[in-house]
Amino acid sequence: MSQLKRILLLNGPNLNMLGVREPTHYGSLSLKTIEQDLQSLAQQYAVELSCFQANSEEKLIEKIHQSFQQIDFIIINPAAFTHTSVALRDALLAVAIPFVEVHLSNVHKREPFRHHSYFSDVAEGVICGLGAKGYEFALQFAVSFLKK
């Protein structure tokens, strides 16, 4: 029997405040609800999903490093680190795990400083502006990608 594919969902700073933080941009669902919904989908897709959120760059980098040869695909919402973190980008490149970048809001409809991402050019794909559904689409893509 083949081993379950392992997918890691990484969420960056302030996403622990989903549901109360700027719901016009980020929606009204909590991160816990989003993660529970994704766990149900992961079971349907017969993949193993682990979830991790941190407000510190160091903790996110450590989690990426720990994923080396342990995780098959990463779904990441780097949040504000999208626009600032060369270190997170380098960590993803170092472990060479394919990933999709997800943003709840359409970053291109927001402030100009949010228009640049340190991740998009090295990601398998980018999903933005679709709210919590974006995570579902990312998981669906990850499953499809891993079947190749």
From Swiss-Prot:
Q: State the SUPFAM superfamilies in the record.
A: Type II 3-dehydroquinate dehydratase
What InterPro entries does this protein map onto?
DHquinase_II, DHquinase_II_CS, DHquinase_II_sf
Keywords associated with the record: Amino-acid biosynthesis, Aromatic amino acid biosynthesis, Lyase
Catalytic activity line of the entry: 3-dehydroquinate = 3-dehydroshikimate + H2O
Q: What is its EC number?
A: 4.2.1.10
Q: Which GO terms describe its biological process?
A: amino acid biosynthetic process; aromatic amino acid family biosynthetic process; chorismate biosynthetic process; quinate catabolic process
Q: Where along the sequence does the record put site: Transition state stabilizer?
A: 21
Residue positions binding substrate: 77, 83, 90, 104-105, 114
What residues sit in the active site? 26 (proton acceptor), 103 (proton donor)
The UniProt record lists the keyword Disulfide bond: no
Pathway per the UniProt entry: Metabolic intermediate biosynthesis; chorismate biosynthesis; chorismate from D-erythrose 4-phosphate and phosphoenolpyruvate: step 3/7
Query: A GO molecular function for this record?
Result: 3-dehydroquinate dehydratase activity
Q: Which NCBIfam families match?
A: aroQ (TIGR01088), PRK05395.1-1 (NF003804), PRK05395.1-2 (NF003805), PRK05395.1-3 (NF003806), PRK05395.1-4 (NF003807)
Which family is it part of? Belongs to the type-II 3-dehydroquinase family.
Family matches, as HAMAP family: AroQ
The subunit field of the Swiss-Prot or TrEMBL record says: Homododecamer.
Q: What does this protein do?
A: Catalyzes a trans-dehydration via an enolate intermediate.
Q: What is this protein called?
A: 3-dehydroquinate dehydratase
Q: Which species does the entry assign this protein to?
A: Pasteurella multocida (strain Pm70)
